[in-house]
Regions:
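Bacterial N-terminal signal peptides that target proteins for export
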Residues: 2-13
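Bacterial N-terminal signal peptides
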Residues: 11-21
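Electrostatic cytochrome c docking/interface patches
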Residues: 25-43, 55-62, 112-139, 160
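Gly/Gly-Pro-rich "capping" loops immediately C-terminal to redox-active cysteine motifs
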Residues: 36-39, 53-86, 92-97, 146, ...
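Extracytoplasmic/secreted proteins, especially bacterial periplasmic and envelope-associated proteins
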Residues: 38-41, 45, 73, 90-93, ...
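The canonical Cys-X-X-Cys-His
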Residues: 44-52, 106, 142-152, 208
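Generic structural signal for alpha-helix termini and adjacent loop/cap motifs
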Residues: 52, 83-84, 113-116, 135-136, ...
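C-terminal capping alpha-helices of c-type cytochrome domains
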Residues: 96-119, 168-171, 195-216
Length: 216
């Protein structure tokens, strides 16, 4: 119970901090237009939590890797936060500090980066993770991750890159998908993951995260 209260308190504090910072970051935009300076200011703001090269950050709250991500996926998720289809109090505030015409340019800026994976996963059943990624688990009605995310796990268009994604973020996100992701099928396709992750055990989730987090 104490851990839950601490997490709630820290989330609230972080949300307050980022709300204030978002207001300051808006000063980088000129008349709401996606100027080069405005986009760069937003990028620098993203690195506050996601790391200097958007490589992600391991901490009490794992921040996902945005570097090298599919630009259309980034655009879709920012709009999902704006429309409250994706639930996260911190990112909801952050997204509201980005003007709509900035979203494509910011997504392209993040997509162009390619830092090495953060690494540091605890060590687990990599072979199982590779099997799930490449072939799925037919007996559990879990399709191969590679079928959508590609053999290199770099995704395509609205399908996200998961190669090099932080182990801790992957485990956390896959574990709570039904409550924080995929609220409806419009206008992105995040909802299709719900039946897939529901059929994975915790051990399988950890093995999968272990495998993909090391991919380049």
């Amino acid at each position: 119970m104490k851990a839950v209260r601490l997490r709630v308190a820290l989330t609230s504090a972080l949300a307050v901090f980022l709300t204030a910072a978002t207001g300051q970051a808006l000063a980088g935009a000129q008349d709401g237009h996606a100027t080069a300076g405005g986009v760069e200011a937003k990028f620098e703001y993203c690195t506050t939590c996601h790391g200097a090269s958007a490589q992600g950050f391991r901490g009490f709250f794992a921040m996902p890797r945005l570097a090298g991500q599919q630009p259309q996926y980034i655009e879709n998720q920012l709009r999902a936060f704006l429309e409250r289809r994706r639930v996260n109090p911190v990112m909801a505030n952050v997204a509201h500090g980005i003007t709509p015409d900035m979203i494509p340019a910011l997504a392209a800026r993040l997509s162009a980066l390619n830092p090495p994976p953060v690494g540091g996963a605890p060590g687990g059943d990599v072979a199982l993770g590779k099997e799930i990624f490449a072939h799925g688990l037919p007996d559990q009605n879990v399709p191969a991750c590679s079928a959508c995310h590609g053999p290199d796990a770099k995704g395509q268009r609205e399908i996200p890159r998961i190669a090099g994604q932080l182990y801790w973020y992957m485990v956390g996100t896959l574990s709570i998908w039904s409550s924080e992701r995929g609220q409806g099928g419009r206008p992105d396709i995040s909802w299709i993951m719900r039946p897939t992750v529901a059929n994975l055990t915790r051990k399988q989730v950890e093995a999968l995260a272990e495998y993909v987090s090391a991919l380049r």
